[in-house]
Structures are given as structure tokens and as C-alpha cells.
Amino acid sequence: MLGVAAAAVQIEGAIADEGRAPVHNDVAGLASAAQNVGGLVTADSSPDYIAIENYYLFKQDIERLAAMGVKYYRFSIPWTRILPFILPGTPVNEQALSHYDELINFVLEKGMQPALMLYHNDAPFQFYGGNLTNLFIAPGTGGIGYLDSCFQCSYKNVSFEDAFVNYGKIVMTHFADRIPIWWSFNEPILASRNGRSINAVIKAHARLSHFYHDEIKGTGRISLTLNDNFGVPRNPQDPADVDAADHFNSFQLATFANPIFLGIDYPESFKSSISDYVPLTAEDLAYINGTADFFSIQPYTATVVSPPNDTIAACSANISHPLRPYCVTQQTITTTGWNIGYRSQSYVYITPTYFRTYLNYLWNTWKTPVAVTEFGFPVFAEQEKSQRDQEFDSPRSQYYQSYLNEGLKAIWEDGVKFVGAFAWTWADNWEFGDYSQKFGIQTVNRTTMERRYKKSFFDYVDFVESRRQKS
């Protein structure tokens, strides 16, 4: 699997067209900076209303990707476009099904394979009861993620879990004959408020996996995608730093991966910090085990990890500790005094050596083929550059080529089953509040909506094709 990825809420626009109901990001965009307590919306923010108008321009976009030799096209479908009233038994938006029928068929016609994310950071607004006061999860408040996607919520006495499974079944039933790769959730830990949120995600995923494989006899593969700015110990010779990195990675990954891939309980890193976690019974674990066909990870960058000033245990026991929930110190400076890598516009640093180590860690821990379903690099200050300078994005090329090169070493020298990579993202788009963090391998003129290829797109494709084994 070698392809590109994007999410509906970041590219489609058309937020009120053809039956789509609001999602939390739409409504957050209406909030003033004064109403938003420490979240994504500021006085300088831009909403997602238009994005890059992919909903209308999808054929043009697919043509451009196919012309470059892309093999897999990862996209998402908004729940509220398929089911505007979100609940089981409410009307299905046939116009939306027709739209995605046309999109999927066009992807196939152009020689690519569609790969579908069912939920990518676009929670139906109905679950919030008209109140987004608690949308953002402030540090030191006992929450887990950054933004509450209401996985633990209910609407009209129907849980998010049950409503999401109903939506997923509708989409799978309609498109399973043409889509070979599926994901249930994107980076759910970042959107989880508490232990009940985690429980709802894991069980909803397992139910949809069983539906896909057991009930409709789907022949493709399904997973959910996890995130982890992979933690590396500040000093690999210091046991305390090693333990802190292990704690950090375990919390982010094993919380989901232990039950789903190994059929075992949540890790102690999670249970010691999240007091309201929902215990998993033996029956739960038997049902959840084996419900993902590959390990889907989005390892954009490494982060340097060390213990907190007190202890991990003390932090875990203190609900208001500012380092919760991970209870470690994260930084970008190594013991040499140097940055861990070349810096981007955001949190991403170019850290390819650690990428190889991380692939080994994932493979050796969970013994499941690993797919990198997002990785990308927003070049520093690209927003301020001329069009021609934006197109000549050598740091992004270096990022992709160096990571893929280390991935090949992991395959051929280490024996890791590294089975796929999806570049994030195929065009500059809405980055949850603004357009200044440019992850794209194409530029977008937001007045004319013209797309132009960047150098990194050619370099990404050339790297892959020049090393592709002939069948």
C-alpha cells in the first residue's frame, strides 16, 4: 500500500450542501476567541467551510493524483453527510451515497485503489447538546486528549458507540464490494476525554470488524489508526529515561493495541492514570482480539522523553498534574544539546533514524504487519514564500525520502513487515484552524482553487517507483 491521504473535514468544504449536517469543527469555527478556552479557534483562525472545495473538484483532484502514479487514495466520509440525523432508523442521505459512489468508481477507473476512513475528526454536533463549552480538553483537568469527540456521549438515549456502528454498517454494506482497505477511527486517543471514551472506541471498532468479516464477508482489511510521536529516551543509557519512554509509548499505543492485537488487558500505564477506565472482561477480550488486520500508525516525528521532576507514579495519582495523561517530560533537545532533527512549521522534526527503530518496536511488540497511514512535513514558514519557492520544497522531499529509506532498511535488514505508507497530504488544506501549516505535496490557490505540484510529490513517487520490485 503506497498512496496519499486526506480527510473530508479538511478538504471537502460544502459543509451545508447536499444534506450534510454540522460537525463539531464547523460549529467551533463560529466561536469567538473569547468564547474558546484554550482551543483551536483564535482571532486569526479560519473555519473549515470552504477548505479546498474537494467535494466539487474531486474528479480533478483524482485525475491529478492518478497522473502522478499514486496507487492508493485514502479519504474519509463524514458521518453527518450519510446520516444527517445521525441515529439508527433516521433517513439515509441517498444523494451522499451517490456522491461517494461516483468518487469511488472514478478512483477505480483511474487505476487507483480507494481506502476509507469511517471517522476522521468530524463528530456530529448533535452529541454535544448544542454546547461546545467543554469541547477543548485543557491540560491538568484529568482528560486524555486535546479535543473531545464525544465518544462517551449519547444523543436521544442512543450512545455514540451504537450510532457509529449503525453508520459504519450502512457505509460498509454499500461500498464493501469496491473498497479493499478500511479504518474505523483516526487517532482516537487525541479525541478521547476519559476511560469511557476509550472503551467506546475499542468496542465500536471490534463490532464493525466482526460485521465486515463475519456478516458481510468482506475480503479486504480493516484497522484503526493510532498516533504516537514516537518517544525516545533522552539518554538511552539511563534506565529512568528508558522507563519513561516505554511508559509514554505504552499509554498511547498499548491502550488500544493490547486488546485488539494481543487479546490482553489495558497496560498499567493507562490504568494507573485513568481511574474511570472501563474494565475489560474475558469475554470482551475474546471478542476484541484479532479485530485489526494490520497495525496502522501515524509516526510523524520522534519526541525526546524523560521522567517528570517528581515521579511518573506521583503524576498518575494527581488528576491536576500538568503533565497528565502521559506523565513524562517531552522535548526536542537531546543530551548533545542539539535538536532531535530539522524543524518544521509545527511539531514535526525530521527524525528518520528513530523511525526505523520505531518500526522495529511496533513489529516486535505486536507481531502484526505495520502500515504508516500518515506521515508528512510542513516546511517552516512556507506560507510566507512565493509560489515558486513553495513548489521547490526540498525539506519535505528530504523528510519523505529519508523516512522511506529507513523503512526499507527495516524491511530488508531487520525483517519488519512494513506493508504500506500514505503521504500526508496530497494538497495543502485546512489544518484544524488555519491554512498556514502546509503539509501538502501540492499547493492550492485559495482564491482560484488551482492546484500545482510541488517538487516533493515527484520525489516521493520517484523514490517508490525506482525501488518497486517487478512482479
Role assignments for model-derived ranges:
Residues I77-V92:
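Glycine-rich, proline-tolerant flexible connector loops at the mouths of alpha/beta enzymes
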Residues P22-E63:
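Aromatic- and Gly/Pro-rich amphipathic surface segment
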Residues G3-V37, F85-L87, L97-S471:
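Active-site region of glycoside hydrolase catalytic domains
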Residues E53-P78, Q113, G290, F294-F295:
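Catalytic domains of carbohydrate-active enzymes, especially glycoside hydrolases
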Residues F58, N93-A96, Y100:
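Generic structural signal for well-ordered secondary structure
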Residues R74-S76, R81, R451-K454:
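Short, cationic motifs built from Arg/Lys/His that form the positively charged side of catalytic pockets
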